[in-house]
């Protein structure tokens, strides 16, 4: 499979991108927006197989993480920076018609892009384990925190009250929460792209989102497109896991509000069904893409 890597100038920095395969016939490329902010493209390499269907798959590290520039620039860590980076990437690579998949923060980015920028040439959106509003997300994570052992709940409350997240007790509580709803530990049997060391965009995450998944406090804390998503015209596939941070309530809220949408719930997954149920996810995704080219 042909893999092309390169860098695009963005602001005074550079953005790394990776293109797998080429489009054949009438197929349109699939562009992937990673989560975080700051999570890197790495985990998306488990979707390289989508290119075997005769479709280019394009992933990139958003500014502030991975193989892209990682300046200490808290002033840049907001939705506008990353959406304009996507717009620039489409121009740079001549991506007139695409399918756009955003996971977690990447899905928020896709939603804001769709609602505020109303871009042309989007054949479909795939909203993967994402959210229409930070307030709904916080409410659902708080509900789930209440299922942790009491001492873990207490450690979280103490850390939040003091604004100090360095205690061992807090870190163990957060790790348990993420183990339940985000992802399992990476081990020797995990795909290489998950085991590979990466430059996580910690500053980008903390500045834009916050200290953890249940306390949005950064530049995205007021993210809310609950009303606007009702006007998305393009076909939308919503994907989520049963134990996902994107709970069935969050996913169904999007499904109910977005007119031309379908929802696929992955029964054995947390926040990354494309990793945990890889074969099924690729099957669902290929079927969707072929239907909407």
Curated annotation (Swiss-Prot):
Gene for this chain: pip
Protein's name according to its UniProt entry: Proline iminopeptidase
Superkingdom of origin organism: Bacteria
GO BP field: proteolysis
Species of the source: Clostridium botulinum (strain Hall / ATCC 3502 / NCTC 13319 / Type A)
Active-site residues annotated for this sequence: 104, 244, 271
Family, similarity comment: Belongs to the peptidase S33 family.
Catalytic activity: Release of N-terminal proline from a peptide
Keyword Protease among record annotations: yes
């Amino acid at each position: 499979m042909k893999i092309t890597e390169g860098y695009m100038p963005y602001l005074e920095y550079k953005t790394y991108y990776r293109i797998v395969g080429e489009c054949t016939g009438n197929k349109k490329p699939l562009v992937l927006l990673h989560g975080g902010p700051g999570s890197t493209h790495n985990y998306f390499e488990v979707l390289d197989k989508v290119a075997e269907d005769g479709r280019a798959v394009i992933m990139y590290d958003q500014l502030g993480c991975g193989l892209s520039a990682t300046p200490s620039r808290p002033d840049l860590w907001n939705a506008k920076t990353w959406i304009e980076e996507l717009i620039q990437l489409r121009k740079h690579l001549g991506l007139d018609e695409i399918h756009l998949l955003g996971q977690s923060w990447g899905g928020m980015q896709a939603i804001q892009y769709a609602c505020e920028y109303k871009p042309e040439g989007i054949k479909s959106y795939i909203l993967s384990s994402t959210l229409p509003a930070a307030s709904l997300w916080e409410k659902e994570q708080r509900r789930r925190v209440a299922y942790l052992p009491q001492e873990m709940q207490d450690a979280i409350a103490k850390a939040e009250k003091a604004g100090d997240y360095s205690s061992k007790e807090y870190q163990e509580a957060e790790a348990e929460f993420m183990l339940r709803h985000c992802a399992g530990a990476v081990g020797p049997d995990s795909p290489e792209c998950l085991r590979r060391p990466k430059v996580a965009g910690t500053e980008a995450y903390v500045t834009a989102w916050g200290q953890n998944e249940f306390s949005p406090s950064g530049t995205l804390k007021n993210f809310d497109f609950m009303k606007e998503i009702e006007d998305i015209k393009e076909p939308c596939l919503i994907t989520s896991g049963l134990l996902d941070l994107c709970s069935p309530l969050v996913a169904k809220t999007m499904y109910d509000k977005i007119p031309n949408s379908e929802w696929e719930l992955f029964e054995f997954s947390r926040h990354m069904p494309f990793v945990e149920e890889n074969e099924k996810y690729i099957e669902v995704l290929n079927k969707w893409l072929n239907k909407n080219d």
